[in-house]
Amino acid sequence: MPQILSPKGTIMKLYNSLTRTKDEFIPHEPGKVSMYTCGPTVYHFAHIGNLRTYIMEDVLEKYLRYTGLDVKRVMNITDVGHLSSDADTGEDKMLKGAKREKKTVMEIAKFYTDAFFADCEKLNIKLPDVIEPATGCIDEFIKVIEALIEKEYAYEAGGNIYFDTSKLKQYYLFNNFEEEDLQDGVREGVEKDDNKRNKADFVLWFTKSKFDDQELKWNSPWGIGYPGWHIECSCISMKHLGEYLDIHCGGIDNAFPHHTNEIAQSEAYVGHKWCNYWFHVLHLNTNGGKMSKSKGEFLTVSLLEEKGYNPLVYRFFCLQSHYRKSLVFSYENLDNAVAAWEKLLARVAKLDKNGDVDNAKFEELKRDFTDAMDNDLNTSLGVTALYNVLKADTNDATKLALIADFDKVLSLNLIEEASKLGAQEEPLDDEFTAKVEALIAERAAAKKEKNFAEADRIRGVLTEMGVEIKDTREGVVWQRI
């Protein structure tokens, strides 16, 4: 199979959670990339930790497109079946949200789906090419489950349909978990289920639920019920991307059991390797640990906006760290990002767009950026490459062209935001200058009338404004201090 090259001829490498190494990225079909993203469970607002994952997935998609690849990206919306333990126990999260807000499940799903899309727009996250809610694919779920039963990878017990993990040569792929990790009470959310043949088995379809008020149910060959969480991503991916998937993305907390179970059921169904590359983004942490809705400790984009933060500053904050490193959020750290952001915009605003682009210099400086991104999507070094452009010995037109080029991937709207900054500052500077000049004229008049006390008072006013004045033979000169 031919290798897919970046614009300068080197091969992009991505850390693959499946192999635990940086692997050369080679799509199954030359020139085309199939990419699947685990979407939100829309029972509440996405917190900024969730959104860090979507930001980094967005950067990956945009960089693949930047290199000339044809990317088709698919994402699910979980609006049924995701239980609170991420396994097969606890309350359905959608039902939990509906009870909390005294609304129907579909009302909750619509509201929080729209809220998620709004957050993505604020953060310059491109929505995937295909977005499919789980409730729209019930027929596909049933078809795959029937096939798994026929192949003896699934069984019925106690009214539910379970996947039989004992049929697999290997189950634990992303971790070092052993059987005892699934013992009752050892891992959070693991509860006893006498219907399972093996502790690692998981539900494909529920007909017997401990929730009598489960709102969403469908007819199936096994009775009225609803799908398990894990089956939806496999089915939605295969529905739109086929039996071979290049990249599967998600947060690291989804690696087990969700992604592990996806691989199990998908490969049992298709009979061959399903996905070649697994891209996992690490947690956003606070001083109290991982940000989590279940703990009731989470921040939203809207809350950051209420506190005066531009959502793009949060994106910038995320890009300054590598996706495989846990990122510590604090307002102090975000304020540091604000300071760096404002300085960056101020430098961009000073660039003169007139002139011709130096193509040789453009390609030379671009190499720093593509080297960074080819090396496991190193956005931290990618941002450094941006700063190197500003310091480079080349003309402003070339610098602006490079900034615009890098921003196809970084999506920080740097030139647009810098233009806003310049437009805001210019009238303020004119107003400030006019006020200073008026005070200097008043001081000159006071000195001419030998009213030195008034002249000293005006000097004090100017000092409080951050202005230093000097009397010279040519007149008064002033500068900010």
Show which residues each predicted segment covers.
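Alpha-helical recognition segments enriched in aromatics with Gly/Pro capping
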Residues: P2-Y43, D58, F117-A118, I138-K350
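N-terminal, positively charged nucleic-acid-binding surface of large information/translation enzymes
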Residues: T19, H28-N124, E474-W478
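Anion (oxyanion) recognition and catalysis
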Residues: R65, I149, T463
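Short, well-structured beta-strand/strand-turn elements
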Residues: D70-K72, E152-G158, D393, E468-K470
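Short, glycine/charge-rich beta-strand/loop segments that flank catalytic centers
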Residues: V74-V80, A109-F116, K126-F141, G159-L168
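The substrate-binding groove and active-site-proximal loops of carbohydrate-active enzymes
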Residues: A98-T104, V130-T135, G223, G251
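Structural preference for alpha-helix termini/caps and helix-kink/transition segments
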Residues: K290-K293, E297-I481
